[in-house]
């Protein structure tokens, strides 16, 4: 996280690549260390990779509240729309999700179910640039922001940039730094 911040990034993501959430206290300690490393000027984004159940998601959301996260991404499995909506409504966290969804219908269930604050269509999964623009329009109607997910290399990132440049509810572009 410190390396990303040192290169001028406005946000740094944290994800479980090595089972850090297998031990909740270890995961929380790592997030606290990330926040300390990047300070308060750089946003901290946390990707949970759909690994929690509702009680654990709510517990972790409460525990990380002092860290002032930019978003709390995909804490629950994607098919649990009502549970995701509960986290969105009651956790005090800004929630994000949808990086592996395909097509407007899947995104629409999340938007109308109020399952997230921020949709994250990925051009390579969602159905291309045009479909991502349609998804963003659908989200805008429901006052949901869009943060294109683009961590699969430069072509994917540039496709995400094209989407971002053409939608009024664009928030942030997620991309893999240094990969």
Language-model region placement:
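Shared catalytic-loop signature of beta/alpha-barrel
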Residues: 62, 68, 77-179
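Metal-dependent enolase-superfamily TIM-barrel catalytic cores that perform enediolate-based chemistry
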Residues: 1-85, 90-91
């Amino acid at each position: 996280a410190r390396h990303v911040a040192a290169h001028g990034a406005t946000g740094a993501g944290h994800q479980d690549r090595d089972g850090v959430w297998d031990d909740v206290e270890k995961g929380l300690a790592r997030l606290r260390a990330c926040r300390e490393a990047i300070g308060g000027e750089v946003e901290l984004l946390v990707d949970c990779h759909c690994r929690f159940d509702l009680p654990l998601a709510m517990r972790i959301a409460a525990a990380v509240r002092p860290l002032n996260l930019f978003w709390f991404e995909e804490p629950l499995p994607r098919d649990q729309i009502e549970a995701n909506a509960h986290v969105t409504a009651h956790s005090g966290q800004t929630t994000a999700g949808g990086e592996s969804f395909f097509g407007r219908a899947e995104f629409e269930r999340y938007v109308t179910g109020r399952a997230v604050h921020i949709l994250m269509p990925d051009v390579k999964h969602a159905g291309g640039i045009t479909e991502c623009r349609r998804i963003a329009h659908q989200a805008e109607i429901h006052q949901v922001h869009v943060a294109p997910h683009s961590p699969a290399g430069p072509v994917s990132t540039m496709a995400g940039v094209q989407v971002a440049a053409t939608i009024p509810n664009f928030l942030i572009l997620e991309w893999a730094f240094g990969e």
